[in-house]
Swiss-Prot record:
Keywords: ANK repeat, Coiled coil, Repeat. It comes from the Eukaryota. This is Ankyrin repeat domain-containing protein 18A. It holds the Pfam family CCDC144C. Residues 262-320 are annotated as: Disordered. It comes from Homo sapiens (Human).
């Protein structure tokens, strides 16, 4: 039993150590490489920098670092109240969790940052959120020494009975943490004294385990239950007895005595007020309870005697009690104790099973722990290898960057040398420029002399341009006159087209009248022959009108072509005007030309509209022709060849339109050769079809002549026999009436038969549906019959099985009697074997306890070794990280140096570009000045000199730089302002 209690104590110590690791160290273990810019600013408490980061990127409000910590978590952990208020003002997530599911409120409470916690609670933070271990903010407040945070949390409705994963309420957690002031505070705030953890330990048991006598007195003052047992069936008194905590045990015994005295007083007071019948029952109950208490005390005394550790005070107390209550109750107590012993045995068996299961679970946990440790070792080796690879890569990058730096140094030196050479070349260029400026002064003097002659030439050129402009204006006037004439022609063509449209409308009216007359002819059949000739004459007249309209259309097309040619001539004239205007640079002519172009485009659009109207008219003519052909078909068979002629006309019209298109296409530019080819192919196909249609027309005309001859013969025959057969017309009419009556009757019969057929078909459909329904019912009936047959078979089988079961029951009854006898024998044997097993179990339990102690020792030793190895690895890892950070800092320095070198190179390259541009400008100026000098020297007037008789003319000499005099030449000028006037005139000409 003592070993079991020591195991409980060790378990409590282990829990305390794990709890210290869990709650120790306020804030976070922070490394700089894990953080972003906003997180660093929050840790430093730089609210302005945090606000700047948020204005740049609003998403960074709830941004996480590499360990899932937000800005609010870090600010609360470090007590940065300004940053916390800023983030809450920006409406960040107040109850956001980190990797361990801890809220910013938990971090503020854990770090004892009361101001941050108050701000969070006032902004509506939830104090009842649980982390991975099931702890709330109140658990963290209990672990701290002060009670102000706990008061704040309780005022904001924190749950005082919140359970963590170990089953600890804040009160139990305070006892485990040995925080007496927190226990007092929680008891004042009505915390539950009778709460129990996962091992069913009460607050009193935990206080006894941790040897906290002051907390025990507090709990006893609150009337806590002394008799409550934990998972192992032990009370607080048992733990005090086994741990030799005499003062605590004495406190518990004194509390028991007080409770008994109070109970007896209450009983006496009640008995005085109650009836005598109820008094006996009360006394018997009180005696029974008292006897049970005495028996429990005797049991404790026996245990104390066996251990020889009970003080003499308790023995004297037991003897006095024995003397008070007498020996006559001992027999009853012995019987009760026997019953309790049987119950204890059963409990011990049940507990043994539990302990075995717990041992198995502990072994499994150890195995899992070893596996996890191995996996951690593998992970550590992998991480070490990975970091070593990263270090090698960084070293390689460092070497590469060093080589690049050396190259850049060489490039820099080379560029410096080039810059020096450029400086020298610039110095030489400047010297040359000074010389050129001196020469320029000489050239300017000569140029002023030439300005006068140029001015005269420019005046003559301007007079010529004015003459040309006058000619152009005259030509434009003529073009406008022609344009107006063309407009008049266009109006005339429009009027002609309107007249033709009216003529077409009249033709349409004539056609409609002809159709009406044809209908009347059909109705008036006897007078048909006389009216046929009239309709044929009208048809011929209509054809003549159509031909006339076609001729008029051809004339209009020719007029349109002439107008187009005139438009092309106008374009040529306008192009000539443009060339003249470009040479003369006259703005007025350009504006007039634009107006003419607009008018020309307008005329073109109108011409296109005329062509469209013409095409529509052609379509209307074709429709008229087709309608005529249809009417002629209905009128007689003999005039069927007209269809062929109409088709021929249509095809001929199509060929004519295609030729027109060809004519238009020939005028277009050379870019549309492909369209030309397609049109040529279409023309060839249309010619071929036109030839075939002509052949067919000839054949149709021959057939038409034959039909006409037949018609003439028939007409003559009819005229001959008209008088003779006039009497027969009445008979024919009566025959026709009879045939019509018969035809109507047949139609009625046919309709009746169709109606009967539809009725029969509907009846057939209904019968088919009824047939399907009956077929389905038949199938269902067959299925029912099969099921009935199966049920009958099953019934027979069940009857046979019932008979078999009855026979078996009789046999079983006989065997039961034998089994009962055998059972009684087995029970006796089982009792004997159970006694043996109890002895064996006690031995094995002792062995198991020894093995458990050894396992715990081995585990602790292995854990210590692993912790040491982990610490070594962490040290190595920290060294690696420091080396990596040093390398990164060096890299950043190299990068900064590289960036500076690049900037210097860029600035040098820009300077070089500027110098190159300056040199190019100077060279262009020199070149232009050389050309000017040559031009001026070539245009100087020749003067005879008496001193040089051999020289006749300056133009015959090649003026090179050798022959230019170094002294300044002075030429007298009559007007000193002429040079400035010339300059202004030249600038105006260049701007134009």
């Amino acid at each position: 039993m003592r070993k079991l209690f020591s195991f409980g104590r060790r378990l409590g110590q282990a829990l305390l150590s794990s709890m210290d690791q869990e709650y120790a160290g306020p804030g976070y273990d922070i490394r700089d490489w894990e953080l972003r810019k906003i997180h660093r600013a929050a840790i430093k408490g730089d609210a302005a920098e945090v606000e700047r980061c948020l204005t740049r990127r609003f998403r960074d409000l709830d941004a996480r670092d590499r360990k899932d910590r937000t800005v609010l978590h870090l600010a609360c952990a470090h007590g940065r109240v300004q940053v916390v208020t800023l983030l809450l003002h920006r409406r960040c997530q107040i109850d956001i969790c980190d990797r361990l599911n801890r809220t910013p409120l938990m971090k503020a409470v854990h770090s004892q940052e009361e101001a941050c916690a108050i701000v969070l609670l006032e902004c509506g933070a939830n104090p009842n959120i649980e982390d991975i271990y099931g702890n709330t903010a109140l658990h963290y407040a209990v672990y701290n020494k002060g009670t102000s945070l706990a008061e704040r949390l309780l005022s904001h409705h924190a749950n005082i009975e919140a359970l963590n994963k170990e089953g600890n309420t804040p009160l139990l957690f305070a006892i485990n943490s040995r925080r007496q002031h927190m226990v007092e505070f929680l008891l004042k705030n009505q915390a539950n004294i009778h709460a129990v953890d996962n091992f069913k330990r009460t607050a009193l048991i935990l206080a006894v385990q941790h040897n906290l006598s002051s907390i025990v007195t507090l709990l006893l003052q609150q009337n806590i239950r002394i008799s409550s047992q934990d998972m192992f069936g032990q009370t607080a008194e048992d733990y005090a007895l086994c741990s030799d905590l005499r003062s605590i045990r004495q406190q518990i015994l004194e509390h028991k005595n007080k409770m008994l005295k109070n109970h007896l007083r209450n009983d006496n007071q009640e008995t005085a007020a109650m009836k005598p019948a109820n008094l006996k029952k009360r006394k018997e109950r009180a005696k029974a309870e008292h006897n049970l208490k005495v028996a429990s005390e005797e049991k404790q005394e026996r245990l104390q005697r066996s251990e020889n550790k009970q003080p003499q005070d308790s023995q004297s107390y037991g003897k006095k009690k024995d003397a008070m209550y007498g020996n006559f109750m001992l027999k009853k107590d012995i019987a009760m104790l026997k019953e309790e012993l049987y119950a204890i045995k059963n409990d011990s068996l049940r507990k043994e099973k539990k302990y075995i299961q717990e041992i198995k679970s502990i072994t499994e946990i150890n195995a899992n722990f070893e596996k996890s440790v191995r996996l951690n070792e593998k992970m550590i080796t992998k991480t070490v290898a990975r970091y070593s690879q990263q270090l090698n890569d960084l070293k390689a990058e460092n070497a590469r960057l060093n080589s690049e730096l050396e190259k850049e140094k060489h490039n820099k030196e080379r560029l410096e040398a080039e810059v020096e050479s450029l400086h020298s070349s610039l110095a030489t260029a400047i010297n040359e420029y000074n010389e050129i400026v001196e020469r320029k002064d000489l050239e300017l003097v000569l140029w002023r002399a030439d300005d006068v002659s140029r001015h005269e030439k420019m005046g003559s050129n301007i007079s010529q341009l004015t003459d040309k402009n006058e000619l152009l204006t005259e030509q434009v006037h003529k073009a406008r006159v022609k344009f107006n004439t063309l407009k008049g022609k266009l109006r005339e063509t429009r009027d002609a087209l309107r007249e033709k449209t009216l003529a077409l409308g009249s033709v349409q009216l004539d056609l409609r009248q002809a159709q009406h007359r044809i209908k009347e002819m059909k109705q008036m059949h006897p007078n048909g022959e006389a009216k046929e000739s009239q309709s044929i004459g009208k048809q011929n007249s209509l054809e003549e009108r159509i031909r006339q309209q076609e001729l008029e259309n051809l004339l209009l097309e020719r007029q349109l072509e002439d107008a187009r040619k005139e438009g092309d001539n106008k374009e040529i004239v306008i192009n000539i005007h443009r060339d003249c205007l470009e040479n003369g640079k006259e703005d007025l002519l350009e504006e007039r030309n634009k107006e003419l172009m607009k008018e020309y485009n307008y005329l073109k659009e109108k011409l296109l509209q005329c062509e469209k109207e013409k095409a529509e008219r052609e379509v209307i003519v074709r429709e008229f022709q087709e309608e005529l052909v249809d009417h002629l078909k209905t009128f007689s068979i003999s005039e069927s060849p007209l269809e062929g002629t109409s088709h021929c006309h249509i095809n001929l019209n199509e060929t004519w339109t295609s030729k027109k298109k060809l004519f238009q296409v020939e005028i277009q530019p050379e870019e549309k050769h492909e369209e030309f080819r397609k049109l040529f192919e279409l023309i060839s196909l249309l010619n071929y079809t036109a030839d075939q249609i002509r052949k067919k027309n000839r054949e149709l005309e021959e057939e038409a002549t034959g039909y006409k001859k037949c018609l003439e013969m028939t007409i003559n025959m009819l005229n001959a026999f008209a008088n003779e057969d006039f009497s027969c017309h009445g008979d024919l009419n009566t025959d026709q009436l009879k045939m019509d009556i018969l035809f109507k009757k047949l139609k009625q019969k046919f309709n009746d038969l169709v109606a009967e057929k539809e009725a029969v078909s509907s009846e057939c459909v209904n019968l088919a549906k009824d047939n399907e329904v009956l077929h389905q019912e038949l199938l269902s009936m067959r299925n029912v019959q099969e099921k009935c047959e199966k049920l009958e078979k099953d019934k027979k089988m069940l009857e046979e099985e019932v008979l078999n079961l009855k026979t078996h029951m009789e046999k079983d009854m006989v065997e039961l009697g034998k089994l009962q006898e055998y059972k009684s024998e087995l029970d006796e044997r089982a009792v004997q074997e159970i006694e043996k097993l109890e002895e064996i179990h006690l031995q094995k339990q002792a062995e198991y306890e020894k093995q458990l102690e050894q396992l715990n020792k081995d585990n602790t030793a292995s854990l210590k070794k692993k912790e040491l190895t982990l610490k070594d690895v962490e040290c190595k890892f920290s060294k690696m990280k420091t080396a990596y950070e040093e390398v990164t800092t060096e890299l950043e320095e190299f990068k900064e140096a590289f960036a500076g070198a690049v900037k210097a190179n860029n600035s040098m390259s820009k300077k070089l570009m500027k110098s190159d541009k300056k040199i190019a400008v100077i060279s262009t100026k020199l070149f232009t000045e050389k050309q000017r000098m040559k031009y001026f020297l070539s245009t100087l007037p020749t003067r005879p000199e008496p001193e040089l008789p051999c020289v006749e003319n300056l133009n015959s000499i090649e003026l090179n730089r050798k022959y230019i005099p170094k002294t300044a030449i002075r030429i007298p000028t009559s007007n000193p302002q002429t040079s400035n006037n010339c300059k202004n005139f030249l600038t105006e000409v260049l701007l134009c």
